[in-house]
Amino acid sequence: MSIYGDYIKSVIRTVPDWPQPGVNFRDITPVLQNSAAFRKLIDSFVHRYQELNLDAIAAIDARGFIIGAPVAYELGCSFVPVRKKGKLPFKTISETYTLEYGASTVELHSDAFREGDRILVMDDLIATGGTMLAAASLIQRSGGQVVETATIIDLPELGGAQKIRDAGHGVFAVCTFTENE
């Protein structure tokens, strides 16, 4: 957890029963609307990764882009979007993963990384871990090395962070939310 974790958590809005009954949606838009909170959020990642000589940030469509791009800028490394299927114009590689009710596919450009590139994978939230694991697989298949996965929010009760750790990847979350928070 970040030194700013409690503060960031206090700014995140919980929207009950959205997008469906029984779901507590963790809304990061109040963080984005508050310049001090957004700066602290980005600084949380920059301070953690500034000495790791990353080659790129691979951020997941779409909310991962919001944090991935400024972190890449601050660290002086490249930014690579991991997109939903059919959104990239050049030759891609893809990875399909299972969801609670079905499957989804993410892609990245086939030339996104060079062999041995050191990559940080970023998204806004880890729930079941499927999207993050699919992105990590794409990176490894393209020759990149996943240094760690990073997120604003971890929902530990859904088990995603543990699945990511079990697959051999580190997980950094600025804050965590239990279901009852």
Swiss-Prot record:
One of its GO terms (molecular function) is adenine binding. InterPro entries: Ade_phspho_trans (IPR005764), PRibTrfase_dom (IPR000836), PRTase-like (IPR029057), UPRTase/APRTase (IPR050054). It holds the Pfam family Pribosyltran. One of its GO terms (cellular component) is cytoplasm. It catalyses: AMP + diphosphate = 5-phospho-alpha-D-ribose 1-diphosphate + adenine. One of its GO terms (biological process) is AMP salvage. SUPFAM superfamilies: PRTase-like. Its main location: cytoplasm. Pathway: Purine metabolism; AMP biosynthesis via salvage pathway; AMP from adenine: step 1/1. It is found in: Cytoplasm. Its EC number is 2.4.2.7. CDD domains: PRTases_typeI. Keywords: Cytoplasm, Glycosyltransferase, Purine salvage, Transferase. Catalyzes a salvage reaction resulting in the formation of AMP, that is energically less costly than de novo synthesis. HAMAP family: Aden_phosphoribosyltr. Homodimer. Belongs to the purine/pyrimidine phosphoribosyltransferase family. This is Adenine phosphoribosyltransferase. It comes from Chromohalobacter salexigens (strain ATCC BAA-138 / DSM 3043 / CIP 106854 / NCIMB 13768 / 1H11). The gene is apt.
